C-alpha cells in the first residue's frame, strides 16, 4: 500500500472471540484482551525462521535468503503491512513505540503478564536491526521492492518478487532512517536493562554508532533509497536526530545528548515547530514531550529555559488534540475520532492517544497541569482523551465495529493483507502464484480464511464511514506503525488492575463472587527430599463472567520459592488446562511449561505468578524438575 504524508493456540483464539463478544454486549472495553491480541499481529508479521513458541499457526518461514545476494544476512524483522517489504523507517518507529511502552508501562504490562510478549516483540525487531548494522557507518534500510511486491498477491511463504536489499552508507546517507533506528535501539536498551543487561548494552552500542552516522552524514533516506519514495516518503530528518538524542540521553544519562538537543533546538525545529501529528514521519511531538519530562522532574539545570520552550510546543500538541488550542485544533470526525488524513488515519489516532497518555503521567507525577489557550487541563483530561480514542477503536463508533481485527463481535473480515486472505501454506500446500492470488483470493467477497488477530486497520473516513473491502486499502490495511502504539495505550488503560481486564472504572465483564465449593483457593507445596527445597503454589480466582452459557474463571497462580537458596530451570506440569495461559512458555512436551527466559531463576523467597482462563475447576499444577 502506498502511504502518503506524513498453550495460546486455536482454543485460546476461539475463547478470545467469546470473551470479546461478552465485552461488547456489556458496552465495556476489555483493554487486557485487546492488548493480548496486538502481540498476535506482530507474530503474523514476522519474517524469517519462526520460533517454536509461534502462536500464529497459519504462518510459516519466509524471507530466509533476504540479503544474501548482497553478501549480508537480513533474515528476520517484520513485514510492513499487508505486503512483504521490510521498510526500515516504520519498522524502527514501531519498535521505538513498543519499547516506550515497556519502559513507561512496565508495571501495567507486568501485572497483565504481557511484559514477556512485549520484549519478544521488541527483540524480533532489534535482532534484525543488529544484523542490518554490520559496520558503524552502514545500515541496511530496506528489503524488497515495493512496486513489484504490490503487483503480486501471494503468501510470504510463496514470495516470487524481488528481495533486493538497500543500504545507507557515507555516500548514500539517511539521517532520518538511521536516527529513528538509533532511537529504537536506545529505547529498547532501556526496556531490556532490568532483564538482560548484556543485550541492553549491545543495543546501546549500536544506537550510539547509528546516531553518530546519522548526524555526521546527513541526508534524506529516500534520496538514497528512491524505491521507498512512493511508500514512506520522509519529510525531513531533523526531528529524528532530536528524537534519537532524547532517547540516548534517557538511556545513558550522558549530557552530550541533552546538549545536542538543546544546542540544535531552534535550528532543527524542536522548539520552533508546533505540530498536530505524531507518526512514523513526524517525531516532533514525541521529542517535545520526552524532553518535557526532564523539566517536570526538576532536572533542567542550565537548560531550563530551552526545555520550557520544548514544553510549550508539547502543550501545543496536547491542547490541539483536546480542542483547547485557541482554534488551532486537530480535526475530529462526528463520532469523536481525531482525523489527520484519509490514508490509514487510525495510525495517527493511536500514536497521539498513547503520547497523551504518556504526557498525562509526566504531568501527574509533577503535580502539574496542561496550560492551554482555552484554559488549564488536569492530567486526567489527557488520559480521558486517550481513552476516548481507544474506545472508538474498540467499537464505540458509528459502525459499532472494532477496528482491531478479532476483537469484539464485529470487526473487519476482508483485511487488505496477503497472508491472511489466502489459505495457510499448511492447509493448501501448493504454491499460490503472483497473478493467481489476485484472481482466486484478492477479489473474493468472502472473509479472510486466516483471522489476523490484533491488527489495527486503516480505519474510517472523516465522516466515520468504513467499507469492509479488501481492495479498499486506504481503510482496510493494517500497519506496524499504526498497531504498535496500542500496546502502551491498552496497557495504560488496563491500569494494572489485578483481577480485571478493564482499566479504571471500565469493567469488562459482569463479575460476581466465585462459587465456593471446588473453586476454593488452596496452597499446595512441593518439597522433594533430595534437595530440601520447597516450592509453594497459591491458586486464586480473581474474576469470573458468563459468555454464552458458560461461566469462565480467571485463575491466578503464585509460585513461591520458600527455600533458602535459588532455583532455576523450573519445569511445571499443568493438567486439566482447557483455556489460554499467560506468563509461562510451553516446552514442546505435553502438559509441560517453564518460566520465561527473563525469569529463569527464582531467588530464595521470591514469587512469580501466571494466569489462565477456563470454565470449570482449576487446573492441576505440579513440579516436574528444577536445578
From Swiss-Prot:
Q: State any GO BP term from the record.
A: cellulose catabolic process
Asked if the keyword Chloroplast belongs to this entry, the reply reads: no
What SMART domains does its record include?
A: CBM49
- Active site positions, chain numbering: 83, 416, 468, 477
Q: Name one Pfam family in it.
A: CBM49
Which ranges does the record mark as transmembrane? none
Q: What EC number(s) is this enzyme filed under?
A: 3.2.1.4
What top-tier enzyme class does this entry carry?
hydrolase
An annotated GO cellular component:
extracellular region
Q: List each coiled-coil range.
A: none
| Gene Ontology molecular function terms on file | carbohydrate binding; cellulase activity
**Where is the protein localized?**
Secreted
**Recorded catalytic activity of this chain's protein:** Endohydrolysis of (1->4)-beta-D-glucosidic linkages in cellulose, lichenin and cereal beta-D-glucans
Kindly give the Gene3D superfamilies that the UniProt entry links to this protein: 1.50.10.10
Q: Which residues are glycosylated?
A: 196, 465, 561
Does this entry carry the keyword ATP-binding? no
- List UniProt keywords, sorted A-Z: Carbohydrate metabolism, Cell wall biogenesis/degradation, Cellulose degradation, Glycoprotein, Glycosidase, Hydrolase, Polysaccharide degradation, Secreted, Signal
Signal peptide residue numbers? 1-26
What family does this chain come from, according to its entry? Belongs to the glycosyl hydrolase 9 (cellulase E) family.
Q: What protein name is recorded for this chain?
A: Endoglucanase 5
| Higher taxonomy | Eukaryota, Viridiplantae, Streptophyta, Embryophyta, Tracheophyta
Amino acid at each position: 500500500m502506498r502511504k502518503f504524508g506524513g498453550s495460546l493456540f486455536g482454543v485460546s483464539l476461539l475463547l478470545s472471540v467469546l470473551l470479546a463478544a461478552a465485552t461488547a454486549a456489556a458496552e465495556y472495553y476489555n483493554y487486557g484482551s485487546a492488548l493480548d491480541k496486538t502481540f498476535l499481529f506482530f507474530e503474523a508479521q514476522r519474517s524469517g525462521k519462526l520460533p517454536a513458541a509461534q502462536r500464529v499457526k497459519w504462518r510459516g518461514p519466509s524471507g530466509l535468503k533476504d540479503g544474501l545476494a548482497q553478501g549480508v544476512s537480513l533474515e528476520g524483522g517484520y513485514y510492513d503491512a499487508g505486503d512483504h517489504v521490510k521498510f526500515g523507517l516504520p519498522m524502527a518507529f514501531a519498535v521505538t513505540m513498543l519499547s516506550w511502552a515497556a519502559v513507561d508501562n512496565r508495571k501495567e504490562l507486568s501485572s497483565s503478564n504481557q511484559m514477556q510478549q512485549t520484549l519478544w516483540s521488541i527483540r524480533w525487531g532489534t535482532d534484525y536491526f543488529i544484523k542490518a548494522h554490520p559496520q558503524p557507518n552502514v545500515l541496511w534500510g530496506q528489503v524488497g521492492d515495493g512496486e513489484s511486491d504490490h503487483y503480486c498477491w501471494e503468501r510470504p511463504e510463496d514470495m516470487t518478487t524481488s528481495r533486493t536489499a538497500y543500504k545507507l552508507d557515507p555516500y548514500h546517507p539517511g539521517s532520518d532512517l538511521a536516527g529513528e533506528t538509533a532511537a529504537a535501539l536506545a529505547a529498547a536498551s532501556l526496556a531490556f536493562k532490568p532483564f538482560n543487561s548484556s543485550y541492553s548494552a549491545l543495543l546501546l552500542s549500536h544506537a550510539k554508532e547509528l546516531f553518530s552516522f546519522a548526524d555526521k552524514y546527513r541526508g534524506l533516506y529516500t534520496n538514497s533509497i528512491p524505491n521507498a519514495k512512493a511508500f514512506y516518503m520522509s519529510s525531513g530528518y531533523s526531528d529524528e536526530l532530536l528524537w534519537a538524542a532524547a532517547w540516548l540521553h534517557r538511556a545513558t544519562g550522558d549530557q552530550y545528548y541533552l546538549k545536542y538537543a538543546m544546542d540544535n533546538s531552534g535550528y532543527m525545529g524542536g522548539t520552533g515547530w508546533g505540530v498536530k501529528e505524531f507518526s512514523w514521519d513526524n517525531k516532533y511531538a514525541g521529542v517535545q514531550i520526552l524532553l518535557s519530562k526532564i523539566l517536570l522532574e526538576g532536572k533542567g539545570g542550565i537548560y531550563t529555559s530551552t526545555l520550557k520552550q520544548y514544553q510549550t510546543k508539547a502543550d501545543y500538541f496536547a491542547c490541539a488534540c483536546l480542542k483547547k488550542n485557541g482554534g488551532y485544533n486537530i480535526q475530529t470526525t462526528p463520532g469523536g475520532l481525531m482525523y489527520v488524513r484519509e490514508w490509514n488515519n487510525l495510525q495517527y489516532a493511536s500514536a497521539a492517544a498513547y503520547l497523551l497518555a504518556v504526557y498525562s503521567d509526566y504531568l501527574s507525577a509533577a503535580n502539574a497541569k496542561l496550560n492551554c489557550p482555552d484554559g488549564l487541563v488536569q492530567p486526567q483530561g489527557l488520559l480521558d482523551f486517550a481513552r476516548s480514542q481507544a474506545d472508538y477503536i474498540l467499537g464505540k463508533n458509528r459502525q459499532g465495529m472494532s477496528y482491531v481485527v478479532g476483537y469484539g463481535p464485529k470487526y473487519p473480515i476482508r483485511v487488505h493483507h496477503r497472508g491472511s486472505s489466502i489459505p495457510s501454506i499448511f492447509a493448501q500446500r501448493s504454491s499460490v502464484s503472483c497473478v493467481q492470488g489476485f484472481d482466486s483470493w484478492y477479489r473474493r467477497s468472502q472473509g479472510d480464511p486466516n483471522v489476523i488477530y490484533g491488527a489495527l486497520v486503516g480505519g474510517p473516513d472523516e465522516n466515520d464511514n468504513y467499507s469492509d473491502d479488501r481492495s479498499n486499502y486506504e481503510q482496510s490495511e493494517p500497519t506496524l506503525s499504526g498497531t504498535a502504539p496500542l500496546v502502551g495505550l491498552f496497557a495504560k488503560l488496563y491500569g494494572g488492575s489485578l483481577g480485571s481486564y478493564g482499566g479504571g472504572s471500565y469493567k469488562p465483564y459482569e463479575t460476581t463472587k466465585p462459587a465456593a465449593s471446588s473453586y476454593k483457593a488452596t496452597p499446595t507445596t512441593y518439597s522433594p527430599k533430595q534437595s530440601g527445597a520447597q516450592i509453594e503454589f497459591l491458586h486464586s480466582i480473581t474474576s469470573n463472567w458468563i459468555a454464552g452459557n458458560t461461566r469462565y474463571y480467571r485463575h491466578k497462580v503464585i509460585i513461591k520459592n520458600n527455600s533458602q537458596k535459588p532455583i532455576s530451570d523450573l519445569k511445571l506440569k499443568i493438567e486439566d488446562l482447557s483455556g489460554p495461559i499467560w506468563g509461562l512458555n510451553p516446552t514442546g512436551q505435553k502438559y509441560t511449561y517453564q518460566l520465561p527466559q527473563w525469569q529463569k531463576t527464582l531467588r530464595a523467597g521470591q514469587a512469580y505468578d501466571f494466569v489462565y482462563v477456563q470454565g470449570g475447576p482449576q487446573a492441576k499444577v505440579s513440579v516436574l524438575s528444577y536445578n
